[in-house]
Amino acid sequence: MNLASISQSYMSHNENERSIVPYIPPPYHPTAPALAVSASQMETMSLGILNQAMSSSAGASGALKDEKAAFGAMAEALRDPEPIRKIKRQVGIQTLKALKVELSGMRRKRLILKIIMFICANVTMATSLVGGISIVDEDIAKHLAFDGKGDWVSKTVHGLNLLCTTMLLAANKISEKVREEIARTKRDIAKRQSYVSAATMSWDGDSVTPLRDVKYGD
């Protein structure tokens, strides 16, 4: 082999090496996920709280139902991402003010209905008593209904009895609806207060510092 062929072979080898651009991978710095443990703990806690909220509430009192609703709201807060949790917290604080105002108005409305029911019940009892006595005593019956001049008294007594009985039944029905609305509003307040409390918890590893003095719609 002469020098010319050796030189040509060397030059072709160098050209092949220059035609291939070597790939240099970027530097890799292994890092462990910082929030993997706490996220897993929050999911586990969320499932446990949700299990408490989904348990049977048959025969439970209103306070226990409010408690289960609060459990469900806390489980929802633990599942939500941090930005959504902050948004819901701000909206919940504003909604709580309106709900408390509505709750005060409904309580005043129910108090007025109770006063009306008390008055109507007393008038109904009094007019029924007068009507019963007029049936037993003939003199009172003659004075109230059968002597011509006193007929208006009997009509007034029976009219008051019918009117107050009707008002009593209507007020009782409205009062029951208001009572159900109060229970629903208190439960909504409990849910939002629990969500706000869970959203304001400070998480530090395995320890949790909750917001104290949580009230359930009172």
From Swiss-Prot:
Which superkingdom heads the taxonomic lineage of this protein's source?
Answer: Viruses
Supply the InterPro entries for this chain. Answer: Orbi_NS3 (IPR002565)
Q: Tell me the function of this protein.
A: May play a role in the release of virions from infected cells.
Q: Which family does it belong to?
A: Belongs to the orbivirus NS3 family.
- In Swiss-Prot or TrEMBL terms, this protein is called Non-structural protein NS3
Query: Gene behind this chain?
Result: Segment-10
